[in-house]
Amino acid sequence: MSNTYAFGKTVATDVGQTIERVTQALAKEGFGILSDIDVAGTLKKKLGLDLPAYRILGACNPQFAHRALEAEPEIGTLLPCNVVVRKVGAGTRVDIMDPLAVMQLVGKPEVATIASEVRGRLQRVLGEI
């Protein structure tokens, strides 16, 4: 997947193992998981659809979130950083929201600086898995 709002990679581990690895790598960078949305499970329950595993993890680093909220109180509409973990073929795809791309919507240099720092941490997370 190539786009301007996320970066990611495909790994050989299953979805469960990948979520564990992602969660551990996020913790090393100061992030916790605020939400875990089972998209495939929800669509199965609500629409009767059988889809491959698809989870959205809402990751947050409290220090960066606090700085961003101080710079722009409405920025909460763009938080937390979403990490998608989904089944693809024989592997698992991990895509992470690019905070620099998304936070450019705010148009404040101090927010862009924070987003750049967060992006670096999230890129290290991707490198760990």
Q: How would you name each of these model-derived features?
A:
Residues 23, 40-41, 123:
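Short glycine-/small-residue-rich flexible loop motifs, especially phosphate/cofactor-binding loops
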Residues 32-84:
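Compact, glycine-rich, soluble single-domain proteins
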Residues 3-5, 53, 79, 90:
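A generic structural signal for well-ordered coil/turn residues at beta-strand boundaries
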Residues 105-129:
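Well-ordered alpha/beta subsegment
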Residues 1-29:
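Terminal, regulation- and interaction-focused segments at domain boundaries
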Residues 28, 45-46, 128:
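Residues at alpha-helix termini
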Residues 81-107:
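Beta-strand/loop substructures that line and gate deep hydrophobic ligand-binding cavities in soluble
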Residues 13, 17, 38, 113, ...:
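Conserved active-site and cofactor/substrate-binding residues in soluble primary-metabolism enzymes
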